[in-house]
UniProtKB/Swiss-Prot annotation:
Name listed for the protein in its UniProt record: Virulence-associated V antigen
Organism: Yersinia pseudotuberculosis serotype I (strain IP32953)
Subcellular location per the Swiss-Prot or TrEMBL entry: Secreted
Biological function: Involved in calcium regulation of yop expression, which includes the export process.
The keyword Methyltransferase belongs to this UniProt entry's keyword annotation: no
UniProt KW keywords: Plasmid, Secreted, Virulence
One Pfam family cited in the UniProt record for this chain: LcrV
Length: 326
């Protein structure tokens, strides 16, 4: 997404430099190269200059027309695509706008332009904008912004929730041994955290596509002996000691913890695991609230778009009915 030049020309230029000309609306315009050449022939300099009255961030002044590729991007950013129907209303409107831009560039005595001023002068001539285009652009931009943010939040929340689920499996195993007053081995006699059944999965392929599996496959493994065969597992200790998770590594772990009413190291271990996962639980709650908010905004943008299209269609239909009735 390219930030508006009106708010911060430096950010506008930075964003333009990150994209290819082919990604901009007017890259295929039949007059793009002609306009670039006209700016060069008239020795027009377009620059960005820090204005303390408008700009919140200080940036270095820069003549951007020294870079022909950047000049082409600036023009392609606002230049519309050629009309598909030649000679139609849109094509005539577009050609008249381009004609006005050419006349302006050829006749203006001023060859030194600040980017904001240059864009302000040519924008409404160069584009065939209508008010409905502007409204649609604002709504669609809002949808895209909130849609992207929602997708990123969903991915992050899925990862956080998966890690929290693994902690809940560990906590359940600890609680089982607390209830029985026994000893939990978290190393070579540990439950295998790679067991899909622990997370409610019955299909191996579905489990391998899950967020839990994506976390666990990054963990170190422990080799255990099952009869005459060796097997690799992700033990509780492997998981807790690993830095390859959001909550980081938990150090100074023993291989096993026993219940003892006088010095209950198993209870202390349970508390340690709970304390380790508590910030993660808080973060999941925070991200869930953010996702709910951003989803609401996204849905509002869709609703606004639907209402606008319905209203636009209704107005156009009435105009057509009035015209056909005359």
């Amino acid at each position: 997404m390219i930030r508006a030049y009106e708010q911060n020309p430096q950010h506008f230029i930075e964003d333009l430099e990150k994209v290819r000309v082919e990604q901009l609306t007017g890259h295929g315009s039949s007059v793009l190269e002609e306009l670039v050449q006209l700016v060069k022939d008239k020795n027009i300099d377009i620059s960005i200059k820090y204005d303390p009255r408008k700009d919140s961030e200080v940036f270095a002044n820069r003549v951007i027309t020294d870079d022909i590729e950047l000049l082409k991007k600036i023009l392609a950013y606002f230049l519309p695509e050629d009309a598909i129907l030649k000679g139609g209303h849109y094509d005539n409107q577009l050609q008249n706008g381009i004609k006005r831009v050419k006349e302006f560039l050829e006749s203006s005595p001023n060859t030194q332009w600040e980017l904001r001023a240059f864009m302000a002068v040519i924008h409404f001539s160069l584009t065939a904008d209508r008010i409905d285009d502007d409204i649609l652009k604002v709504i669609v931009d809002s949808m895209n912004h909130h849609g992207d943010a929602r997708s990123k939040l969903r991915e992050e929340l899925a990862e956080l929730t998966a890690e929290l689920k693994i902690y809940s499996v560990i906590q359940a195993e600890i609680n089982k041994h607390l209830s029985s007053g026994g000893t939990i081995n978290i190393h070579d006699k540990s439950i295998n955290l790679m067991d899909k059944n622990l997370y409610g999965y019955t299909d191996e392929e579905i489990f391998k596509a899950s967020a839990e599996y994506k976390i666990l496959e990054k963990m170190p493994q422990t080799t255990i002996q099952e009869g005459e065969t060796e097997k690799k597992i992700v033990s509780i200790k492997n998981f807790l000691e690993s830095e390859k998770k959001r909550t980081g590594a938990l150090g100074n772990l023993k291989d096993s913890y026993s219940y003892n009413k006088d010095n209950n190291e198993l209870s202390h271990f349970a508390t340690t695991c709970s304390d380790k996962s508590r910030p993660l639980n808080d973060l999941v709650s925070q991200k869930t609230t953010q996702l709910s908010d951003i989803t609401s905004r996204f849905n509002s943008a869709i609703e606004a778009l639907n209402r606008f299209i319905q209203k636009y269609d209704s107005v156009m239909q009435r105009l057509l009915d009035d015209t056909s009735g005359k």
